C-alpha cells in the first residue's frame, strides 16, 4: 500500500467521550475512514503509519441525516468509523504521525 492510499484511507482520529473511554480501558482507537476502505486496508494503514500491531478492526457506517438548508432539503454525508484494537501495551500517539509523515516525505 503506497503512502497516498494510506492518507486516503485514514481521515483522522475521532475525539469523543466514548472513544476516550475505549482508548483508556480496552486499547481501542477510533478513526474516521474512507467509506470504501476495507478492514484489511485500515489495518495495514494503521500499522504502517503508527508502527503498532493491530489485533482486529471493527467498522460502522453512520448514515447521513436529511437536514433543511433554508428552503431546500439536503443530506449530510455518510461517515464510516473504524474501531481499531491494538496489541496490549501499545498506543497511537499523534506525535508518531508527525515523525512518520516527515520520514515518508523524504
Curated annotation (Swiss-Prot):
GO terms for cellular component: ribonucleoprotein complex; ribosome. InterPro entries: Nucleotide-bd_a/b_plait_sf, Ribosomal_uL23-like, Ribosomal_uL23/eL15/eS24_sf. It holds the Pfam family Ribosomal_L23. SUPFAM superfamilies: Ribosomal proteins S24e, L23 and L15e (SSF54189). Belongs to the universal ribosomal protein uL23 family. One of its GO terms (molecular function) is structural constituent of ribosome. This is Large ribosomal subunit protein uL23. It comes from Acinetobacter baumannii (strain SDF). Part of the 50S ribosomal subunit. Contacts protein L29, and trigger factor when it is bound to the ribosome. GO terms for biological process: translation. Gene3D superfamilies: 3.30.70.330. Keywords: Ribonucleoprotein, Ribosomal protein, RNA-binding, rRNA-binding. Disulfide bonds: none annotated. One of the early assembly proteins it binds 23S rRNA. One of the proteins that surrounds the polypeptide exit tunnel on the outside of the ribosome. Forms the main docking site for trigger factor binding to the ribosome.
Amino acid at each position: 500500500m503506497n503512502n497516498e492510499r494510506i492518507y486516503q484511507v485514514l481521515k483522522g482520529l475521532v475525539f469523543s467521550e466514548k472513544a476516550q473511554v475505549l482508548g483508556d480501558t480496552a486499547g481501542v482507537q477510533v478513526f474516521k475512514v474512507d467509506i470504501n476502505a476495507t478492514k484489511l486496508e485500515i489495518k495495514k494503514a494503521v500499522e504502517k503509519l503508527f508502527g503498532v500491531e493491530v489485533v482486529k478492526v471493527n467498522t460502522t457506517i453512520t448514515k447521513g441525516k436529511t437536514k433543511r438548508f433554508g428552503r431546500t432539503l439536503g443530506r449530510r454525508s455518510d461517515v464510516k468509523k473504524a474501531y481499531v484494537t491494538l496489541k496490549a501495551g501499545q498506543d497511537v500517539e499523534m506525535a508518531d504521525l508527525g515523525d512518520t509523515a516527515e520520514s515518508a516525505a523524504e
